[in-house]
Each structure stands twice: as C-alpha cells, then as structure tokens.
Amino acid sequence: MDITIQHPWFKRALGPLIPSRLFDQFFGEGLFEYDLLPLFSSTISPYYRQSLFRTVLESGISEVRSDRDKFTIFLDVKHFSPEDLSVKVIEDFVEIHGKHNERQDDHGYISREFHRRYRLPSNVDQAAITCSLSADGMLTFAAPKVQSNTDPSHNERPIPVSREEKPTSAPPS
C-alpha cells in the first residue's frame, strides 16, 4: 500500500494555485478530463481540483459592479428557469434565490438551490430596479443610482425576472 506523504511547506507553496474542493460550486456537474489526471488527483491531494480551465462566468461566481450612475450584479444561473428564480429587495439588500426540484441530467438526478444576498448602495433608486435573464443563463440585476441623498423606501418588493432572447457571453466592460 502506497501512502503519499505531503510536507506542510508543499501544501502552503501550492495552496494559492490550486483551489480547495471543499468549497467547490461545481458539485453534481460530473467529472472533467483534468479531474482524472493522476498528477493532480494523487500527487497533491484528493481535496484539490485544477480549475484553471474554467472562466469566472462559467463558475457560477457573481460579479458586482458599482459605477457612478448604476449598480449591477451579474450572476450565472444557467441551471435555472425564470420560474425557479426569486429576486427581492428587502430594505437595503437584494436577495436572489434559485431552486429547482429534482430532475434528470446526463449524470443522473439532481436538484439545486442557492441563496445570494447583496447590500445595495444607499443612493440606489429602488423604484427603477430591473432584472433580466439572458438566453445563456446570465441573470443581470441593474439599479440606477440617484444623485440626491434621499432615503430609499424600506420595504420588501419582488423584482420580476424577464427572459431575453440573445445570449450574454460576458458582462459588458
């Protein structure tokens, strides 16, 4: 029986280059070719995955932008339909919730659920907030900012999610 021994300096030296699998958002999506490479699976550790081949937008990680005149959130929700998504503004926060029941995919049956909560800037016009879902599954939450320092209304208000026909391959820079 072979046991791989890893020195602490080896883990720390490569730690920033190889993200931890413990907090991986890609569970349930199957294996990739680089998951099966013995170099990364046995030499380093079974708890690490080489994720350099994925772009940020494919990973499900959100992008938040706060420009001078607009606050925008881009979130990859490609596994959810508009009926599976709920977007609400509660006081100074926007809450995005997605849930779909168990369904069959290429690897078996899967159900997914997520909750995201973002603090809105104090100068956002909450009455003019929009939210849309592109054909390729990119959710775009946009809130224009007002120049005056008026206090926004503090109540819960659902934001409808509209479907766009064109894909959003990347958020505009």
From Swiss-Prot:
Residues 144-173 are annotated as: Disordered. The modification N-acetylmethionine is found at residue 1. PROSITE patterns: SHSP. One of its GO terms (molecular function) is metal ion binding. Zn(2+) 2 binds at residue 107. Zn(2+) 1 binds at residues 100, 102. One of its GO terms (biological process) is lens development in camera-type eye. Gene3D superfamilies: 2.60.40.790. GO terms for cellular component: cytoplasm; nucleus. It is found in: Cytoplasm; Nucleus. Residues 153-167 have a biased composition (Basic and acidic residues). The keyword Cytoplasm applies. It holds the Pfam family HSP20. Residues 52-162 form the sHSP domain. Heteropolymer composed of three CRYAA and one CRYAB subunits. Inter-subunit bridging via zinc ions enhances stability, which is crucial as there is no protein turn over in the lens. Can also form homodimers and homotetramers (dimers of dimers) which serve as the building blocks of homooligomers. Within homooligomers, the zinc-binding motif is created from residues of 3 different molecules. His-100 and Glu-102 from one molecule are ligands of the zinc ion, and His-107 and His-154 residues from additional molecules complete the site with tetrahedral coordination geometry. This is Alpha-crystallin A chain. The lineage of its organism: Eukaryota, Metazoa, Chordata, Craniata, Vertebrata. The gene is CRYAA.
